[in-house]
UniProtKB/Swiss-Prot annotation:
SUPFAM superfamilies per record: S-adenosyl-L-methionine-dependent methyltransferases (SSF53335)
The protein's name: Ribosomal RNA large subunit methyltransferase F
Entry similarity comment: Belongs to the methyltransferase superfamily. METTL16/RlmF family.
Keywords for this protein: Cytoplasm, Methyltransferase, rRNA processing, S-adenosyl-L-methionine, Transferase
């Protein structure tokens, strides 16, 4: 066991009475998700010693980090990315989104299955497979996972120049990302594809974690509820996001429904330049409006892929304008 100054957290945990026994695997995660097992904090601490000061015994006698502490969550992510994905350098600004990695990995793996469903159940891999990450942020999570798991190359876009500067540092310090992740700034805050997608560029899929809320007040209220559930009874009027996030990452006019509806509308102009457009949808109540928008633009095929992490259920919606014949031609040209 690793020792922790000033007191061994594992020793404290092991001596606690009524230690709760947790299942060895997290329910609901994709079979290929590297994070199905419970966190091995011994192994993570070897990979990232900076995590050690943030480890402490829980009320159940287990070892964990304080998920209400943004710095602890950031250090856990840093350890996970180094241990599982070989990322030697990873740092993000204090106010940037620090997403839970297991859920993000699930999106990537289910997206791989979506591509495989059009390719004889074989996942297309390698640098020929190009993906567009809308809102890549400073964290670069989707490109990191997609490159490590499937060898895909990515273009990541964002409206925040500071986030892109941090992302560029992550790319420059990790050899595996230097030739597989290209970053572009979206200079029009009202545009999604326009301005960052060249006329001749083709993508096998897009992915996006859209802003969830419709206002800053709504985002703050959600954070207060999360902190209350985590046992933080004294919550400030302006609470700190435990997973971080700037305004542009957390909310936009119209919220999730408005953002994805605009994405659907813009996708028409790129109909023949992309196989699958996709976006996470956090609120189930958002789905009817998105389906309506997709019927309006006459998408040829629409799929909703459900995902689960414990009791939390999420999904992403995927749509394509390619006919079956066009899909077959795309596969033969790019995935063979």
């Amino acid at each position: 066991m690793l020792s922790y100054a000033p007191e061994n957290a594992y020793q404290r945990a092991s001596t606690m009475e009524n230690k709760k026994v947790f299942p060895k695997e997290k329910s609901g995660l994709h079979p290929r998700n590297r994070h199905r097992s419970r966190y091995d904090f011994d192994a993570l601490s070897v990979s990232c010693p900076e995590l050690i000061p943030f480890l402490a015994p829980t009320a159940y006698g287990d070892i964990s980090v304080d998920f209400a502490d943004p710095l602890a969550v950031k250090m856990l992510n840093k350890a996970l990315l180094k241990h599982f994905y070989g990322i030697e350098y990873w740092d993000i600004p204090a106010d940037s989104l620090c997403p839970p990695i297991p859920g993000r990995a699930d999106y990537v793996h289910h997206l791989a299955d979506l591509l495989a469903s059009c390719n004889g159940e074989v996942i297309p891999k390698g640098k020929n497979i190009a993906l567009l990450d809308i809102g890549v942020g400073a964290n670069c999570i989707y490109p990191i996972i997609g490159q490590r798991e499937y060898g895909w190359r990515f273009t990541g876009t964002d409206i925040d120049s500071h986030a892109l500067s941090a992302a560029k540092m992550v790319v420059s310090m990790n050899p595996t990302l230097k030739n597989t992740l290209r970053l572009k700034q979206q200079k029009d805050p009202h545009a999604i594809f326009e301005g960052v997608w060249a006329v001749n560029e083709r993508y096998d899929a897009t992915l996006c974690n859209p802003p969830f809320h419709g206002s800053a007040e709504e985002a703050a209220a959600t954070t207060r509820r999360k902190l209350h559930k985590l046992g933080k009874n004294e919550v400030a009027a302006k609470p700190v996001q435990n997973f971080g996030g700037k305004n542009s990452e957390l909310w936009c006019e119209g919220g999730e429904e408005g953002f994805v509806s605009r994405m659907v509308a813009e996708s028409v102009a790129k109909a023949q330049n992309c196989f699958w457009f996709t976006s996470l949808i956090s609120k189930k109540t958002t789905l009817p409006a998105i389906y309506h928008a997709l019927r309006y633009v006459k998408a040829v095929e629409v799929r909703t892929i459900e995902m689960a992490q414990g009791q939390k259920v999420s999904r992403f919606v995927a749509w394509t304008f390619l006919t079956l014949e066009q899909q077959a031609a795309w596969v033969a040209e790019r995935w063979a």
